Amino acid sequence: MGNLDSDGAGSVELLFKNQASLKLSITSNKAKIVDDYFEIKKRILYFDDPFVINNLSNRLYKANQVGNDHNSDNVSLLKNSIIDTSSADIRQAIVNKKLEDLKSSISTICKGNLFENEFGDYVYKEEGSDKAYFLKNLSSGLKTFVLFNTFLQSGVIESGATIIFDEPEIHLHPKWQLEFAKMIVQLQKALNLNILINTHSPYFLYALEVFVKKYGTLESTRYYFAHIEDRCPVIEDVSSDIERIYKTLFSPLQLLENVRDSL
């Protein structure tokens, strides 16, 4: 990585499961591929905002089609996921079989699906109920699971794909954080996904750590610690010493404990 105080170019090298690498040079916030690049044939998804689901209404959707950002992509994928009902081919049937346990877990929280009503608005309806809820009225936590479940049901999340979760715990109740962490681990194991998770929550991190051990994916899991050294960002593999991450994440709580003890 580069330094804002330096005129030199920054660099990033991405290694994909020890098989292929991609080197980038970054100057003035613009990235350039250094070496010959390889073709990424699987889908890459980036989740950082469950409220993107609100943009499914026709008027807002058209307004948000302009631009080339991940949220616009997610809106397009969501709309196509609702319209496309042809995912019951042989390959998808095999995937669905692998995901039976995961879908069972999701159904305890997300008990319905998205539909387009007669007015062209997208709504959420639970199975066995005639009540329809406008998406803007769903809780932020439920939005997270609805988004996740819609992509899962439609086959958007395919075997071998790459998913980036940017602080997925932010909008979730602590109990739902545990469920979501479990679902992420189950999903990775079932579909052999490449998953990158960024979190500032020791609670969510611990949940991931526990479920990784429970579902036997420890060998394919790495933990990285992002910090600053000499005014430069460093991303360090601390898989053998995860306590370094917990120590940093728990430090604000320790400050509160110190204040309380001084009262």
Protein language model annotation of sequence segments:
Residues 93, 171, 195:
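Charge-dense, low-complexity intrinsically disordered segments
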Residues 1-160, 229, 233-263:
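Phosphate-coordinating catalytic segments in nucleotide- and nucleic-acid-processing enzymes
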Residues 173-174, 178:
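Conserved D-loop-proximal element of ABC-family nucleotide-binding domains
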